[in-house]
Amino acid sequence: MQTTYSKFFLAGRTVHQITFDPATFTEADLLWLPHHEQLSSAGRKRKADHLAGRIAAFHALNRQTLPGIGTSGEPLWPAGVCGSISHSGSLAVAICQKKSLVGIDCEAIIAENEARDIQDGVVDTQEAQRLPQEAQRLAESGLPFELAFTLAFSAKESLFKALFPQVQTWMGFESARVTALTSDTLTLTLTCPLPPFVQNQAFTLHWCRIDAQVITLICDA
């Protein structure tokens, strides 16, 4: 599969990036992964996405090793390392560091009409538990609706990736709310306890835009 490696900085952290052409993927490419047999029943797109993400992770791990696949599909990082992987379209990103919360997500900016169709399943329009309406916060940001909505979607994905190693349970979009959104950061607040994390605990994420993609990152050293 044709790939190109690069890196950039977000929130002072190095993000490792792979751009790839899924059309050039072959089954033989997958043999590079020690766990390739676990992907034998996956579709072609899933295999290409997974491979690109693991290549990004390989660079994040100083080209020393590759994360395997956990029972819930999560990456298995080396002992003492926390990391995160994401892919969207022809872009894959990965980041890792020692013993901290870390979660990254990349998403293609969702078209406005589609965003409005699905917004009720992602953001809340009702006030609850003394937290402001998410829809109101997105509007107050001054960002175009489709960008603000995609950031909310992506940020929740990043947060859930970061919390999962400790929470070890499924989290819905309603588990966290956007309580602030600026030109480069976003704050999410938990709407319920997710032990060891508590209700109303807030997390700050950083974001950037690369062409038609957004990348959100939580990286709590």
Model-derived segments and spans:
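Core catalytic alpha/beta fold that binds nucleotide/phospho-ligands
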Residues: M1-A221
